[in-house]
């Protein structure tokens, strides 16, 4: 590991302070900006997200799956006074968000089982589903209706 950390430090990917602690280097920020400028998927998706938000009267999110979490890339907020909002870049648990439930329902069953049985599914509210078995009927319902709903989970 020491060799890898040294290589990353030399490349500017990480920094190290006098106490030996590491943190992300400026080079990673530069790479992120370059990728963001070259491939702004949120700009491509935004007109479609706006159209969907206008049609449904709800907030619309563009998210990606990252292991057992979803990361919000873009958002179009509903005009309703009571609406769901999310911070861009926020990492949310896959098992208690509508975005995560969609990934689980429309991905492979093997992947859903792997994610939902890998560790403890933390209950964020009394309504949070916390077992693979509890998820099966919910995922079947989502596949049938074509959308997912988060209900105070």
List each language-model region with its residue ranges.
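Short, basic/aromatic recognition patches
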Residues: 44-52, 116-153
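Amphipathic alpha-helical effector-binding/dimerization core
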Residues: 23-119
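Beta-hairpin "wing" of winged helix-turn-helix
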Residues: 8-19, 23
């Amino acid at each position: 590991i020491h060799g890898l950390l040294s290589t990353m430090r030399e490349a500017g990917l990480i920094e190290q302070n006098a106490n030996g602690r590491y943190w992300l280097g400026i080079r990673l920020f530069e790479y992120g900006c370059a990728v963001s400028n070259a491939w702004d998927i949120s700009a491509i998706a935004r007109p479609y997200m706006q159209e969907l938000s206008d049609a449904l009267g709800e907030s619309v999110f563009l998210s990606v799956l990252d292991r057992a979490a979803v990361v919000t890339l873009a958002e179009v907020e509903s005009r309703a006074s009571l609406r769901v909002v999310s911070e861009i870049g926020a990492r949310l648990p896959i098992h208690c968000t509508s975005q995560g439930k969609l990934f689980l329902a429309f991905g492979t069953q093997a992947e859903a089982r792997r994610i939902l049985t890998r560790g403890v599914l933390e209950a964020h509210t009394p309504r949070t589903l916390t077992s693979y078995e509890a998820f099966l009927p919910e995922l079947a319902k989502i596949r049938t209706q074509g959308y997912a709903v988060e209900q105070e989970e």
